[in-house]
Swiss-Prot record:
Residues covered by region (Disordered): 1-27
Any one GO biological process: mitochondrial respiratory chain complex I assembly
Keyword entries, A-Z: Chaperone, Membrane, Mitochondrion, Transmembrane, Transmembrane helix
Name of the gene: timmdc1
Similarity remark: Belongs to the Tim17/Tim22/Tim23 family.
Protein name as annotated: Complex I assembly factor TIMMDC1, mitochondrial
Length: 256
């Protein structure tokens, strides 16, 4: 009877540090994944884009509200200080510049934090819906615009809430179309890019893990070979000694 081949040992399991490249199936698991840094300590790209858009919105809002306010404050100060006497022309110019700076800071701050809050809420809601449903749709931006517009008009009561939601939803659709168009020009969306990067990272880690296992097996084989060599040499020496001819026996008479 032919001997059957010994069963192959199963492949060793991958370490826990090598995560599954597939995105989590649950929407809430994908949401929780947004707040978990990777091995390098970096947060997902979606969180980074929200922070960057908030900073950009604050800067643009500050410039949009601060520059006209600075010009208006300077002109108003000059008109109100026509009868004021200054010791030197430099003092008058400095006072006008200080008035412009105060106006820029005051109204720039007002516009800056409001635009930053608007952009942050809009991007947070749209990104959350996209991650939860794991797909990109214009309805996400419409819903984000409705939520943002309603919150900003909440102080006006129910009528303000409804009107703000309608206006926000209407403005969210073209904004979403613009964002989707920019992502299509780049070739892939953030979700597609994230899937590709997860798959590439997984493949690289598996290759590295396989290479480490191969090196470990080679080292173990060398150790076993080095341990077997001395034993084989000793066995050969014993066999050589056993094959040597025996010495002739010495009789008692010859010994005398």
């Amino acid at each position: 009877m032919a001997q059957s081949d010994p069963p192959k040992s199963p492949d060793p399991p991958l370490p826990t540090s090598i995560r599954n490249p597939q995105t989590p199936e649950s929407g809430w698991d994908r949401i929780r994944e947004l707040f978990q840094p990777n091995e390098q300590g970096h947060y997902p790209e979606e969180v980074g884009s929200i922070v960057k858009s908030a900073v950009t919105g604050a800067l643009l809002g500050g410039i949009y509200g601060g520059l006209p306010a600075a010009r208006h404050s300077k002109e108003r100060y000059i008109q109100q200080s026509q009868a004021q006497i200054y010791q030197h022309r430099v003092e008058a110019v400095r006072s006008a510049h200080n008035a412009a700076l105060r106006g820029f800071i005051r109204y720039g701050w007002r516009w800056g934090w409001r635009v930053a809050a608007f952009v942050t809420i809009f991007n947070s809601v749209s990104t959350g819906l996209t991650v939860y449903r794991d797909k990109l749709a214009l309805s996400h931006y419409a819903a984000a615009g409705a939520v943002t517009g309603g919150l900003f008009r909440l102080n006006l009561g129910l009528v303000g809430l409804l009107s703000g939601s309608l206006i926000g939803a209407a403005l969210g659709v073209p904004a979403g179309a613009l964002i989707s168009g920019l992502q299509s020009i780049s070739g892939e969306s953030i979700r597609e890019k994230k899937r590709r990067e997860r798959q590439e990272l997984y493949e690289n880690k598996v290759q590295e893990w396989s290479a480490r296992l191969q090196v470990t097996d080679e080292v173990l084989e060398e150790m076993e070979t080095s341990q077997q060599d001395p034993l084989e040499q000793q066995v050969e020496k014993i066999q050589e000694l056993l094959q040597l001819p025996r010495n002739p026996a010495v009789s008692p008479k010859e010994g005398r």
